[in-house]
Amino acid sequence: MRRRYELHPRLWKKIEPLLPHPTHHGGPGRPWHDHYTILNGILWMLHSGAPWRDLPERYGPWQTVYDRFNRWRKDGTWARLVTWLLDHLQRRGCLGRDLWCVDASIIRASHAAAGAKKNPGRARVLAGPKAAQLQEPPSHALGYSQGGFGTKVHLVCEDHGILLGIYVTPGQRHESQFFETVIERVLVPHRRGQRYWPERMAGDKGYSYRHIRRWLKRHGTRGVIPTRKNQPRDLGFEKAQYRRRNIVERAIGWYKECRHLATRYDKLAVNYVAFWLVAMMERDLRFLGLSDTD
């Protein structure tokens, strides 16, 4: 019987061929534990927000599940899964190009997230396609803002609420400084003969800066960003399109239902981002399942 948080077998079959072969884990010894069981254990961690040691025994030893999560982060498996799913959704016409939305959200960090070395002796990386690659920052993307100790998550989604890219910074950093960075981390592969950038890009007043508007103009994208009080009024502002921006806030709300994302427990930023990729994979699979006609 399938338990809560576990992946439906029909959706599992879509990504099973993309995972490393269970008998080839890169070293000597016994074959890997069953991928499906391990993945369900990782999904349980994502949704429950519990410590690794509290993982139910039905998913195997917690060390095994934790090691598999880290191995797939280091070899780029998580990022490749999300990239493949987004490309599959793109081919089916499920990704909108009319309006993309950018936003940032403060994530409170638990005291357990503090204490990692500022300069770890060995490289900590999130591997995968170029847009997903991340080197562990010295700050571990942790800092103090008005919301307290935490991380700021910058993200971009399309007009159906499908998350396309993510980046993390210390909580006190302003979102306007990382607009181009999060856009560069969009994981949708470019297909020849198809427009890549959207017709419109929506953001709140925090993105009303000259360098952002220049970037949008350079890429042929219309900005749907309200001006601040100290700026000239934008007579071409599309108020009706701006109302659609709430899709990114609804998407953030869905992801924050995953307790491991709503509060940061990971000491390393690369592990926290990897959990976001796991959540993106799960949500993309749901969209893919809804789009199935066979």
Indicate residue ranges for each PLM-predicted region.
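Short alpha-helical elements
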Residues: 1-294
